[in-house]
Amino acid sequence: MEQNDLGLIEKIVYLNRVAKVVKGGRRFSFSALVVVGDGKGQVGFGLGKANEVPEAIRKASEKARKEMISVPLLDGTLPYEVLGRYGAGRVMLKPASKGTGIIAGGPVRAVLEVVGVHDILTKAIGTNNPHNVLRATIAGLASLRSADEVGQLRGKKVVTPRK
């Protein structure tokens, strides 16, 4: 996990080496899956491909910065339970009480850490392909709506309860 000059947190989720067999031997190429976030509700991901690892990572992080989405957070967790779907991948994201931590594995953990979630329960179902699991997680987070957005859609006034 590294932080760049814009205050964005960058995480490499997956690096893959592929080989093309040619007359002279094997030609290797690399793909990198990177997530970028600000730790305050913004997140994006990118897939970069190149002949060298650093170039693939650079391309992936550029794409991730261009396609960032905003996620409504509530006290370091999500406002409600959501299920993200992509391909065969399903990711269940369930809000948790303070002190629980991030109960997640692999790509799901990387996304939640860069988005700024501190307490959550998750379960990835159907596939363990990092690309599909990551996209299912992003799809789930993108489907979240804040209380104000829901109120506007329903034409109702949002009232916050007193503690």
UniProtKB/Swiss-Prot annotation:
UniProt-listed InterPro entries: Ribosomal_Su5_D2-typ_SF, Ribosomal_uS5, Ribosomal_uS5_bac-type, Ribosomal_uS5_C, Ribosomal_uS5_N, Ribosomal_uS5_N_CS, Ribsml_uS5_D2-typ_fold_subgr
A GO term for molecular function: structural constituent of ribosome
GO biological process: translation
Pfam family, one: Ribosomal_S5
Superkingdom to which the source organism belongs: Bacteria
Xref: Gene3D superfamilies: 3.30.160.20, 3.30.230.10
Keywords: Ribonucleoprotein, Ribosomal protein, RNA-binding, rRNA-binding
HAMAP family according to UniProt: Ribosomal_uS5_B (MF_01307_B)
Family: Belongs to the universal ribosomal protein uS5 family.
NCBIfam families reported for this sequence: rpsE_bact
Free-text note on domains in this protein's UniProt record: The N-terminal domain interacts with the head of the 30S subunit; the C-terminal domain interacts with the body and contacts protein S4. The interaction surface between S4 and S5 is involved in control of translational fidelity.
Summary of subunit composition and partner proteins: Part of the 30S ribosomal subunit. Contacts proteins S4 and S8.
Protein function: With S4 and S12 plays an important role in translational accuracy.
Protein name, per record: Small ribosomal subunit protein uS5
The organism of origin for this protein: Maridesulfovibrio salexigens (strain ATCC 14822 / DSM 2638 / NCIMB 8403 / VKM B-1763)
Gene name for this UniProt entry: rpsE
